[in-house]
């Protein structure tokens, strides 16, 4: 257990995960072919029949857009498995597609490796197909067997995504589940349940609160309850947040005639500012269609999103770093600027509680922005100003602040 005065610090694996910042969620499965969000486990497995599935298209699109990891729904609530599991016949081995020899999880994992992005797995605890679900002991063993197959056959894995939806009030053997993950994939993040190393932000809008610290002792279980999860006693204090949101409003799986719900570039950038820009990772869902491909409109929007992030933030005017409660950035000539990005050196913990940004102009300091938590990253937008000096001042902190980087930008974007 941690002492009350012991500062929380991330593990090296958590630091690596937080530096990834952008992840792609892929909801794909039997729901895709039955126009459903939540299947009840009774759909004919043979309805799963992607005509031209290409996981390389998924991984290449993700990489080109600047996303660093991809998480696939290996099994959603309907219980249909996208790998040829030995635990149930309700899987790709029981379909005519590829004569029962297909393995979506393997193809996706290999595509991610080929493209140089990390691969993670979503495995729903709730299973609406499996008959033994009603028997807690039997289902716990069933679930562990599925988990072991994925952990031992498809790694390395960056993250195991455990969904609380449908499991409100249900107790699983989270100690065994988490021990199994750390035993076979010690570098993988555990999402939100049991003994998590990362937590859910608490909504499906991709939005973190203005003050979003990396330390937490609880998190919301699902969209369908306000109850908070009880984590295992040995859960770390450092549990950074992940924000998830679908690129098509309110729909995680692909649906016919749904292109009108595609988020605009402006909406996606607002989400970026309020997720990555508030120190969390963003997990954006893009769903393959019945061909087994990202729809053209979705892929194009994703690439536009990546291009816009690079356009705004790939070339800082200047960057400085260092310890202390005040950092000043000095330019040789005055320049227009409208954004500042601050990053703490989180390997030593999160120390800043409140700060302000000021620009030096005509011998005076003009306040540009104020904020609270910084953590991994904080994006600050302010009205365009021309200045040659910018000052970052910590107003409240624990221990001496350590600034990994303090950068200013001119994007030309009015927000």
Stretches found by the model and what they are:
Residues 1-384, 393-415:
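Mature catalytic domains of secreted/periplasmic carbohydrate-active enzymes
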Residues 387-389:
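Extracellular Ig-like/FN3 beta-sandwich strand-entry sites
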